[in-house]
Amino acid sequence: MAADTLSASILEQDDPQLIQEGAPAYLLLLDGFISRNPEDTALLAAGAQLYALYGSRFAADEQRAIELTTKARRYGRAALCLEHEWACSLELGGYETYVEQLSRVTRRDIDLLYAYAVSWLSYLDATSDDWTAVAELPWVEAALQRVLALDDTYANGAVHGYLGTLNALRPPALGGMPEVSQAHFERAIELSEGRDLGVKVEYARRYARLMFDQELHDRLLTEVLEAPADAPGLTLFNALAKEDARRLLATSEEYF
């Protein structure tokens, strides 16, 4: 209950600056709950996702982002490990063994697996200058693919948005799969009924810019700016998406 209440109070805010200034108090409170209940997997999963969000979007500098997402990663790992002993050594073998072990995660544990994947991805984003981070991306993608296999509608299809981004990181000439990226973004929009504005922003930023499709780029961003930000569990993300959409649209002519 405490984890749900804390998460909701942050995600329902439509003022990113207020969250930037006030969220550290929530994170400290959540840390306190976790220290008193170190085996509460729901609290750990909530901590993983909130630290991932704050580290990715509100950290003051690169080093701070690394520190915050490192904690997110630690919480995400701990939650899955506490639920399944075999998960404690999940990353110690090779990639093939890792993927095989992921198949043991069931629908009952989808919250934990999602938090594990998202917190890892936030850490890799914060350390993207490190080639080790690049090498770990397939591991995160495999975890997200497992979430997808368990329930592709989970979190209003947010996992499709992440997979859309991952599949657009490389151009076709370097082995990228833009058609797969586009399919994921379209599915994410469908599942959220267009309410997840962040998906449209990433669709424009990652896919449309990669493919030099200005018409799609500008249409998606205009839709974001014209849409309401308020949506259950998405209000903060949508407010941030609107900020990003304004910046991207302002540089459209220059980019294309």
Task: Give short role names for the model-derived ranges.
Residues 1-157, 170, 190-195, 209-256:
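N-terminal alpha-helical interaction modules that lie
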Residues 167-190:
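Outer-membrane beta-barrel transmembrane domain signature
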Residues 182-194, 200-211:
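An amphipathic alpha-helical core segment
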